[in-house]
Amino acid sequence: MKSAIFAAAVLGAAGVSAHGYVSKAILDGKEYTGYLPYEDPYHNPPPERIFRKIAGNGPIEDLTSIDLQCGGWQNSGSAPAPLTAEPVTPGTVQKLQWTTWPDSHKGPIITYMARCPGDCSEYEPGTDAVWFKIAEDGKHDDGSWASDPLINDVPYEFTIPEGLAPGNYIVRHELWALHAAWTYPGAQVYPSCFQVKVVGDGTQQPTNLVAFPGEYTPDTPGVVYDIYQNNEPYPIPGPPVWTPA
């Protein structure tokens, strides 16, 4: 009950402005503007992006919804973007800048990739198991969370795995907010997808592929977690991070 009362106060204070999305990516040093849900649809023609459309700055709470994949609408949960980023090199650090993030919205940050069978601008994964996890960060030993640096507008950094075979890929990046996750539904997932071309001489193809929706259920460890009263380590949802052999 205490968790519910405290979270209600947090939610009331935070309001809609507490929500967010990826506003830009810096990939191999080149800057790409994210999909801007409150600007792009009102341009004629809309600007072409490497990011797939999102409905707005709000979260996904229904883990069975196709919107969980990339944050789109029900009829186009991961509608392809018209552009693909210029080639990126495995082993390099990439950066994602979020809009201002509230300090009440604690949670993990998880990043996946999926190989496109051809041009990513013509590919929708649907519910196929095509995703592999490349990075995750959750609750730290000192009680801080992966999401905390975003409060100060610090970009999130991740690395394209070394050894990954060249090709066209979708990067699926998600931020969780657990301020109401003591029950299901309650956890808020903020997914974002963009398209990249990986180059290099890598030969490895990940296994242990998962689907979105499909991988997360109400019973998945980490989906229900009381950040106000649970002092145990946080189990990050999803499969293990893929590690090249």
Curated annotation (Swiss-Prot):
GO MF: metal ion binding; monooxygenase activity
UniProt keyword terms in alphabetical order: Carbohydrate metabolism, Cellulose degradation, Copper, Disulfide bond, Metal-binding, Monooxygenase, Oxidoreductase, Polysaccharide degradation, Secreted, Signal
UniProt EC number: 1.14.99.56
Subcellular localization: Secreted
UniProt entry tagged with the keyword Disulfide bond: yes
Required co-factors: Cu(2+)
Family classification: Belongs to the polysaccharide monooxygenase AA9 family.
Protein name, per record: AA9 family lytic polysaccharide monooxygenase B
Phylogenetic lineage: Eukaryota, Fungi, Dikarya, Ascomycota, Pezizomycotina
